[in-house]
Regions:
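Surface-exposed amphipathic alpha-helical segments
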Residues: 130-155
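Positively charged n-region of N-terminal signal peptides that target proteins for export
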Residues: 1-4
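C-terminal motif of bacterial Sec signal peptides marking the signal peptidase cleavage site
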Residues: 15-18
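Short, surface-exposed coil-to-beta transition loops
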Residues: 44-47, 56-59, 108-116
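N-terminal "mature-domain start" segment
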Residues: 20-54, 85, 149-153
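Short, solvent-exposed coil/turn segments at beta-strand boundaries
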Residues: 31-36, 53-56, 66, 96-99, ...
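A short acidic-to-branched-hydrophobic micro-motif
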Residues: 49-77, 127-133
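Signature of long, low-cysteine stretches enriched in small and polar/charged residues
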Residues: 84-121
């Protein structure tokens, strides 16, 4: 059930993302680290999705990185649109600023599902998403640590 929920979260995380055009996505990421620590589920020139090798972890993570078109990335309302989308799905917004949104998607029977989405233009226009399934409620600090971990994959 947890794995299905996480897959669903990963699909939701990519709902508003469009592809960009220049270098391959892997040129912006620490692929050696990703290959050694995670299972790559999907990879092409525009996006990569990788998951924890240990599927029985108490906090299971799916990371998605996707290049965006400049016009979509520059949209000042992209976070507001994500917020509206999540609120329409009865999710709880934990944190939101101009480039990041952290959402509690599901809390049921000691299972928690979170989505973290952020946008980064330090190398190219990227959307980074972390979908998390956990058997315990995560603190805001723990969620920000997962956001920092996602950012640590950037070269």
């Amino acid at each position: 059930m947890k794995k299905f929920l996480i897959f669903l979260l990963a699909v939701l995380a990519l709902t508003f993302v469009a592809c960009g055009k220049d270098k391959d996505i892997e040129s912006y990421l620490d692929m050696e680290r990703i290959n050694s620590e995670f299972n790559i589920e999907k990879q092409d020139k525009e996006q990569i999705k990788f998951t924890d090798k240990d599927e029985s972890r108490s906090v299971y993570r799916i990371f998605n990185f996707q290049k965006m078109k400049n016009v979509d990335f520059k949209n000042p309302k992209k976070i507001d649109k994500l917020e509206e989308f999540y609120l329409g799905k009865n999710c709880e917004i934990i944190y939101k600023d101009e480039s990041t949104i952290i959402v509690l998607v599901l809390a049921q029977d000691n299972s928690y599902a979170y989505n973290i989405q952020t946008f980064d233009d330090s190398k190219t226009e990227l959307m980074m998403a972390v979908s998390i399934g956990s058997d315990k409620e995560l603190s805001e600090d723990e969620l920000f640590n997962l956001l920092d971990e996602a950012k640590s994959f950037l070269k």
